[in-house]
Every structure is written in structure tokens, then in C-alpha cells.
């Protein structure tokens, strides 16, 4: 269960919004082309690295997409 999501817009060709729920270690990614995904068991350090990356999309593809379990929300 997701509690309170801290959602922020990002400058990325592929990603529109990134949210993180500190209580559940859930990362939510909203794609510009459509689709919302929730990645589970994502450490807070991984979220901070994503948010401070020079390319959010590249960082997401390399370090998160295939590394954590996820569900498609919409």
C-alpha cells in the first residue's frame, strides 16, 4: 500500500514525473508517452541518485528499470 508519494516533475525526453514513497520504498514513474509504473523495494539512495542524475531517462534505464519489481498502475 502506497502512503504519501512525493512527486516531482523532471526534465526528460521520456519521463514526466517521478514520485517516491519513503515509508514503502516505492518509486512511481510517469512516462510522457503514457503509462504509470510503480517500482517496489527501491532504496532511498537509488531515488536520490535518480533525481540528481544528469539524465533521468538514462539513469532510470540503466539502474532501475530491470533491477526492481514493478506493477503498471495505468
Q: Where is each model-derived feature located?
A:
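Acidic/histidine-enriched, beta-strand-rich ligand/metal-binding domains
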Residues: 2-74
Amino acid at each position: 500500500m502506497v502512503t504519501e508519494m512525493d512527486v516531482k516533475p523532471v526534465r526528460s525526453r521520456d519521463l514526466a514525473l517521478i514520485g517516491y514513497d519513503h515509508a514503502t520504498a516505492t518509486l512511481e514513474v510517469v512516462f510522457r508517452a503514457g503509462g504509470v509504473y510503480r517500482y517496489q523495494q527501491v532504496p532511498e539512495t537509488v531515488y536520490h541518485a535518480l533525481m540528481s542524475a544528469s539524465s533521468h531517462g538514462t539513469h532510470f534505464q540503466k539502474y532501475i528499470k530491470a533491477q526492481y519489481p514493478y506493477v503498471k498502475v495505468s
